[in-house]
Amino acid sequence: MSVIKMTDLDLAGKRVLIRADLNVPVKDGKVTSDARIRASLPTIETALKQGAKVMVTSHLGRPTEGEYNEEFSLLPVVNYLKDKLSAPVRLAKDYLDGVEIAAGELVVLENVRFNKGEKKDDETLSKKYAALCDVYVMDAFGTAHRAQASTHGVGKFAPIACAGPLLSAELEALGKALGNPARPMVAIVGGSKVSTKLTVLGALSKIADQLIVGGGIANTFVAAQGNNVGKSLYEADLIPEAKRLLETCDIPVPTDVRVATEFSETATATLKPANQIKDDEQILDLGDESAERLAEILKNAKTILWNGPVGVFEFPNFRKGTEIVARAIAESEAFSIAGGGDTLAAIDLFGIADQISYISTGGGAFLEFVEGKKLPAVVMLEERAKQ
């Protein structure tokens, strides 16, 4: 995958437009989780240190396109950046006709979704973004799967279009895990629905030496073995697909599970064999035996790709399976890559972020890359690198 990297360019005196992912949760005008901004800081600081005239922009939330809405303003992000950077930082609301900017200054361009045509990758808007800069830096992996004006169109018209350090690292880590993985490679796909992850399972079944399923996805596999799953979340119409995957891949299906008679935080967990579930029960977690069997598999892995929890870990009584699996990944010597919102929440809960080799910032983009789909932003950067 050959793209121009920001780190290979001399940015001194250049107008640099960075498309970052600053889509953070905001409450009462304050940023409540700064992970995405923190991840973007090194890119911004590198450009500032080189004496570039730096602009950074992002989307935030889902405002009505083309309309200014204070609720979705990047102002809280600007205030956060003022605290963290020694450089002067200001917000520009009207910037499509040009921005006055000094070297070593950071100008945050207001929410791109306030601009009509952003989501449709409008060419006129893309050219306006491109006219603002000498160098366009795509650094938002989380939106790389969307062809929009600020993530894709602008790169076609900017004098130079390159990948920022965050995007480069993401592509490198995914390439390492999927392109030429150290073996054995183990892939864990959890979460609630098989249908949304079927293509992922199919793609991974061709790459991984061992496929592991968890959560609602595993329930469909338990049912595919002819077991009653009671009120469990599962997808009856996908049982034939689960059977096909079981025939072609070695997938360890849970042999024991934790069940409850209601889906609630206070529900009592009952540990039982997976083939003895009653009609009024639902599977909410793996049993100890099943979780330990997965931990054993993970211990011997050389590459681990983790997407999705293996139980309803948000409920304390149904957390154990995900915790056993998470700690096994953390303690493994394998190159481990984790992605997806629920996965990141589990990593935070168990405090193992430092023990995962690479944590992906992209949800949908992460899954599409794993499926083998071409991400529009990456395709654009590759094409620009050839010119």
Curated annotation (Swiss-Prot):
Residue numbers binding substrate: 21-23, 36, 59-62, 113, 146
Molecular function, one GO term: ADP binding
A GO cellular component annotation in the UniProt record: cytosol
Intrachain disulfide bonds: none
Domain of life: Bacteria
Binding positions (ATP): 197, 314, 340-343
Protein localization: Cytoplasm
Pathway membership, UniProt: Carbohydrate degradation; glycolysis; pyruvate from D-glyceraldehyde 3-phosphate: step 2/5
UniProt enzyme class: transferase
Enzyme Commission code: 2.7.2.3
Keywords assigned by UniProt, alphabetized: ATP-binding, Cytoplasm, Glycolysis, Kinase, Nucleotide-binding, Transferase
Coiled-coil spans in chain: none
InterPro entries in the record: Phosphoglycerate_kinase, Phosphoglycerate_kinase_CS, Phosphoglycerate_kinase_N, Phosphoglycerate_kinase_sf
GO-annotated biological processes: gluconeogenesis; glycolytic process
Catalytic activity of the protein: (2R)-3-phosphoglycerate + ATP = (2R)-3-phospho-glyceroyl phosphate + ADP
Subunit composition and interactions: Monomer.
Family listed: Belongs to the phosphoglycerate kinase family.
Protein name (database record): Phosphoglycerate kinase
Organism: Yersinia enterocolitica serotype O:8 / biotype 1B (strain NCTC 13174 / 8081)
Organism lineage: Bacteria, Pseudomonadati, Pseudomonadota, Gammaproteobacteria, Enterobacterales
